[in-house]
């Protein structure tokens, strides 16, 4: 394929391109992702045709340069009616070009011209905007340059295609409905051209002279002030370099960036003749030189492309569609005709996945023609580039140059576009592969060959020149020089050459992350090396900055505002696949790092120059957090705006994790150095303590670099708009999590908006309107299932901790916002102080009894209680013009709160709305009554009456109503004998209705009687779903602790005789329900796929007077199946003494009762099943005849394997299973189902179930790898997606069955496939033969065509790998593997994060596989470290306390041996099996040569590593430490060749990542060290 590109085309079907229009010679921009409405700033020279139309020195419109004396714009820009003027004069108009920043008159190429003439189209219609076009002729002539160029004018037939992506630019309104909020800097955006039919659908009034452009979902558009500006579209049919044509002029539209309403543009091609008529020569050929070059071949084929010509351009695949793809290897060989010249290569746009050494994706540039990387001469490498910074220009040594582009298997970005041209051989060269003089406003350069080693005895010099008035800052992104005597060094001078003062000299690794500023506008950099050892060198980034005399007077310390607007509201914006934020739009966002070069770990928010607020859980497990990065946007790029600051101190809230998990999950970081505020580094505001949650109509966002999909962290800062979820709704969602009032929830459970790991500690901010500041309401704490559509994110509520923050961080350094409305918005004079000297009174809202409807209303009355011995009875009627909905209540309501003497707020009541209420308040404090209405269209009214009353008594010497956080109550006369005929009542009130109360009785002695019929105590838990009664209690047994909701009604009665000491009780208010261990007196919550619970004391007799509750919750979509392993309660015909009641759901509703059980009639075969995913079990015992109780087992079952009936009790198992064989459920992707007769006796029936996604096929192996030893009366029956009860009852037939198979495996099929996603296997045996056993292997397949090499499945011969070791934590969780290398030493990987006090070791295939071996000490290789998440020297040795006997060690490798038949070994994790598995998995491995491995992993491989490709799969993290063993043909012995260390980011994917091998530690490399340690 040969494609010839010509800058002038004369085809009737393609645009006529003149040689000097539509080009961007100074282009330095990245891909456009923003918008003008909330848009992204343009770069210098990115829109060289852009002009500004000023009237009386005020910019009112845009325009487009089309010639040296002509500007094209919209006619309505010079229409006096648009400005409500009688007339408008051209003498008051100006044209300005190359104006990037309106506040800076020194923009490169900026020129201002007076207007000579204005020509408005003769048929312009101001009502319809038809023919909205005008020509402006200027006085003088525009001088073209890098930042000033004309746009091309299309011909009459050159219509732009539907769907074409075009660019818009301007200084217009950046936020719709907030007019005159125009930016100072030129904005840009990318839009899509709509089809004519779509345009008419949005605007039926549009004419044929108009086109529409925008986004389908809105959010991107031009706006007021952009009028007259360009819609520039690229023409790329025959050229890789786009030439831009002016296809449209910004004209009109409905709103700005609204969904369904694109912008409307005057279609320029319809006026080409009209333009030519006035400009005459404009469309004629300008007789410019025509540049021609050819491209031969596909760059991504094996041979690559050849580019021939004196100048031209090319780009990476997919560049113009926005992104390259994975797994690319592309090559361009550039050849210029003049063999005496050099090639200068310039990147105009650049965006490649970043790594310090460009290990992932990169662009390599070589001098000369290179066939392939493997054969390339390292000396020819000019540089290897990645990241988002544009590299500086590169120079070849001769007339040819090679560019090689590689991408790995994941994370792709924009790509690049490059231009080249021939230059003279005497062009000044830096010695680093590029030009010597650097003039662009920012750029990147490196030592020659970087990241390969630089040359010996070399000199690299370059000088950087900034415009007058600017200075230069140089930052080293990477720096590593050889030698210890500074013979290799980088010297930096404050001037044009080395004769100027030297700023600094850097050597070894001194330059890493160092920023070097100049004091003038020039800087000279000199890199010199000696003839000894070399290293990788350096990579540097420079930029121009202000010299400190800036006139910017912005107060960046003002909290909650950003200098850059955020993206306009998006529907379903989310961090999980969410919106990329605009750089600088969230200036308080910071990134927490474990080290100055480490990856993002957690988020946080700036609250003052020296303080950061974040989540405590980010800090507790990472004591080495030492740095924060502020002003960051792209994690992979060192940006001008960002700064790294060390952390001096960490403060975790003292209540963190107190009482419940995730409580008080908040922490403060004090910085070692204060931050300097700027446009990208600013503080966020605090809410007032009164406003605990955002207002109903506030817009709220969460930001961060969290996971965009499972395990993929965002490269650029993302934002998501989240709705606040009501607390009670959040409680209903998180039924198995404990929440409290210190938390708030946000997210949309219907659309899956959420944050993920990595966003932890980040801000949840809200604002009331676009003119208001952003306020920090939440700190990202936790959630369930990243991006789940069912669970919102949970945030620490900041208002709960403001006092602590201010006290810790010093009130003078923290900015806070008290949310107050503009006083002019509300009714005045509605504040009143009421001193209650009379016993009763009233108050009312303005104009009562009429509803107040003249605007928003905020009223406040303070009621001062003069008589503290009385209670206040309040009755009020609150009228509301809207229905009583949660939304309406949040807008208009009444609240009552206690006011303490120190000015703080105590217990709060409300909000109340749309109802009549009667409240009895027993308070010793003053009260504040607040009436609030925040919407003018809502009418409200209030009438409140109050009356002082004597405090009501309980009858036992205390008040009847107890409203304290904690307290006591007791029987009358306690501790003396209580009175006869006592009648006492108490109401215990929680201060907040959603809190819980807990009662503990420390003394208890009442008359004992059957059913407590004489003296008794009853506790009633009053809930909105019904009352829950505890008791009655009597006798001398102290009842268990009782926990309930926010209101307890307590009754004590005594009869006329036999009075005792009585009782003493304490109560306390809790923020959340505690987890009861026994379930007695409260609720024990259980979850998971299976589990057990039992009555207290089981198998001994339970206690008297128990009330126990268990609530079981399993995953949504599953049901709870329950059976009792043992059951023994007191028996009665109606179960009226001791009983167990089973309910559907969390509450004990009679209509949801499944059954009531007692006595001995519950059998093992009885099955009880819920209709939903929640089941409740209540257990009660009376005062006598206590039995053994019960042991219950529950299992989560899918609806497809369960019955629909509520009560399963009649579905008995037909035969009792014996021998201790229990049902097992397998959910892993692969596993082994095994049985050994020696573990069981007698008749045995075992059920094994494999449950998986219905999209999977379950493959069951029956041959070769299977072990079947079944006798005549032994059988295995396989059922495909059949109800378990039907299997046991025998009402269905199996789909496959085999029996009596001993040594006849070849008669069976190789494997069986089942499509249902669920199979059950019923094994039956009479137990007569002691050698009955079997092993069956299964694996989940995507479809039936999937194939798997059997070598990667479980090994079928135990004992073959006796030296294989499993490493378990103290909780018996398997985390790593290892291998025995001597009688007391085990080798494994250092990345296992070993701690001797927490490791237990077993040998799965040893003589005693269950024995646990203790650890004496651990020796980690002294040079073990992580370099950019890649482990180096990943080896550790474990010494055992006792020597290993009867197990030979593995053979260590011999250097002279040649190995074949290599395998990696692994200990599997099997569901339903013992905690310590006794089986080893084996997978065959094809080892790779070291150079191939280096190329595959792109230089990440070091000499201590080996590579191998596992047949059919990859290792996962749980394989770490496992051995790579190979057999020697000479002696058939197995040799320990490698240790599983690391590999692809995503495992078990046989397609996308097949090119990348796994990486192992080379044991041979460390033989000397190993020998030294173990000897």
Swiss-Prot record:
GO cellular component: extracellular region
Signal peptide (UniProt feature, chain positions): 1-19
Intrachain S-S bonds: 61-77, 166-233, 199-212, 223-256, 300-330, 358-386, 432-460, 486-507, 602-618, 700-766, 730-745, 756-786, 830-859, 889-913, 956-984, 1012-1034, 1080-1108, 1135-1158, 1221-1246, 1376-1392, 1493-1507
One record GO biological process: fertilization
All copies of domain Peptidase S1, residue ranges: 36-280, 575-810, 1314-1575
Annotated compartments: Secreted
E.C. no: 3.4.21.-
UniProt domain CUB: residue ranges: 300-423, 432-545, 830-949, 956-1070, 1080-1197, 1221-1341
Main location: secreted
Active site (record annotation): 76, 132, 227, 617, 665, 760
Function of the protein: May be responsible for elevation of the vitelline coat at the late developmental stage of oogenesis and during fertilization in ovarian eggs.
Descriptive protein name: Ovochymase
Organism: Halocynthia roretzi
Gene behind the chain: OVCH
